[in-house]
Amino acid sequence: MAAIQANVTTGIPANANTITSSEPVRPLANFPPSVWGDRFLSFSLDKSELERHAIAMEKPKEDLRKLIVDPTMDSNEKLGLIYSVHRLGLTYMFMKEIESQLDKLFKEFSLQDCEEVDLYTISINFQVFRHLGYKLPSDVFNKFKDASSGTFRESITRDVKGMLGLYESAQLRTRGEKVLDEASVFIEGKLKSVVSTLEGNLAQQVKQSLRRPFHQGMPMIEARLYFSNYEEECSSHDSLFKLAKLHFKYLELQQKEELRIVTKWWKDMRFQETTPYIRDRVPEIYLWILGLYFEPRYSLARIIATKITLFLVVLDDTYDAYATIEEIRLLTDAINKWDISAMEQIPEYIRPFYKILLDEYAEIENIMAREGRANTVIASKEAFQDIARGYLEEAEWTNNGYVASFPEYMKNGLITSAYNVISKSALVGMGEIVSEDALAWYESHLKTLQASELISRLQDDVMTYQFERERGQSATGVDAFIKTYGVSEKKAIDELKIMIENAWKDINEGCLKPRQVSMDLLAPILNLARMIDVVYRYDDGFTFPGKTLKEYINLLFVGSLPM
């Protein structure tokens, strides 16, 4: 994919952002510049080093495989081992062996077996089963509640590790699991009250979980943090420790090369010259896509999805922070036509982007057609056209000073959340698992997809509405909710957060067996919701990436794990 190129037309003004007396007033956002520059262009992959790490992984991988299926290992110890394997991002290597063990243990499960088991162990067991699709009943936690009052016993507050396990377990709850709803609120308060008194790894574990529970974090980052903060668990088995370190190094090399490829592509396309008003966020977008799937086999998929998502950034910022309403209408019409002849009707400054967009999609479609999977590219392209129409709708609202009703806003807002474009584009390079049936399932837009899409829309709205409002945008979910239901701003935000919480419960339910599609296809849906949480939980981490995303990029691509 590094070779995928498009010729940029010449004759573009040196700075499309320059405003002369003859130009219209534009809604410029003055986005912060990239903090990375050309830093990632200089990486040079030594393929022999990558191969050495692949070979070195084989021995500890085989040793760990034997441990996972060891019939003499105690069930709690085995579940603890599988938990560490999962937290370290190694599950995909042993899925067959892990499922065979969990099938057996799940069939043998009995509530009576939990009577003498401590809170931490029960929590770990619960998380293992739930993370891997087995609906272990939440009743396992009822023993820690007072029978007369119905509240959690104060005695568990002396077990910080147990509380931490219960808090992480509560993130996996589905609708109607009252014991876990109560646990989430109760334990969060208790952990916040004691975290400042803790020391060492336990302090880091609690801080990490309170900042962002594992289930809602980016898998690659969570794996690295687990390796750093759970030394005892990671070093309990030599094969686990060795494999994790080698795996991290292998992924680091592969992913730095992918980041170099997309950075060079972006630079060669000259977007910063032809559309200088846009957000320059190549490492951030690559990180976002890496959050959907980190496994080595999805290297091509990551490169394709990153490029398409970068197109989306150019489109979004053109509609939102540069183009006039007349220009937006013309560009939307051209994208609907998807034909090079339409280039004459659009403003000169956006013509290079339009040509690159069509050329790149055509080349990706040719590549996928050779594998019999051009349908995934077509689905991505149609989603791109949908979002252009959605952006136009928002622009018309803003131009007319119109505040939509909340249902009206959500109908269009689910499109403009970019969820559909990113999720469909993520499928393009995934290979044979994206069958006709799998694509049809995506198109059917069932509950799990709807939930992830809703999180993508509302988490963004809750964090960005003030910035958008300051820039004269009337199309925000918070404003639509206030207008429709006559509530205060605080009440509107609280209600949207409840909707987000319930959507997480629906995603959790959708990932449990029996599933409609394989977890390979569900994982990007779950992980896209996770990445929305990463980017928007505390601030608009994409527009202003100086905090969380910068920290994560440094951890994965700048710093290096000592070998």
Swiss-Prot record:
Which reaction is this enzyme known to catalyze?
Answer: (2E,6E)-farnesyl diphosphate = (+)-(R)-germacrene A + diphosphate
Query: Which keywords are on file for this protein?
Result: Lyase, Magnesium, Manganese, Metal-binding
Record GO terms (molecular function): germacrene-A synthase activity; magnesium ion binding
* A biological process from GO: diterpenoid biosynthetic process
Bilayer-spanning residue ranges:
none
Pfam families in the record, alphabetically? Terpene_synth, Terpene_synth_C
Q: Does the keyword Metal-binding apply?
A: yes
Cofactors (names): Mg(2+); Mn(2+)
Entry EC no(s): 4.2.3.23
Please tell me where Mg(2+) 3 binds in this chain: 460, 464, 468
Its tissue distribution reads: High expression in disk florets, moderate expression in ray florets and detected in leaves and stems, but not in roots.
Q: Does the keyword ATP-binding apply?
A: no
Quote the record's domain comment. The Asp-Asp-Xaa-Xaa-Asp/Glu (DDXXD/E) motif is important for the catalytic activity, presumably through binding to Mg(2+).
Q: Which family does it belong to?
A: Belongs to the terpene synthase family. Tpsa subfamily.
Q: What does this protein do?
A: Sesquiterpene synthase involved in germacrene A biosynthesis. May be involved in the biosynthesis of the sesquiterpene lactone matricine, one of the major active compounds of chamomile flowers.
- Name of the molecule in the record: Germacrene-A synthase
Q: Which organism is it from?
A: Matricaria chamomilla var. recutita (German chamomile)
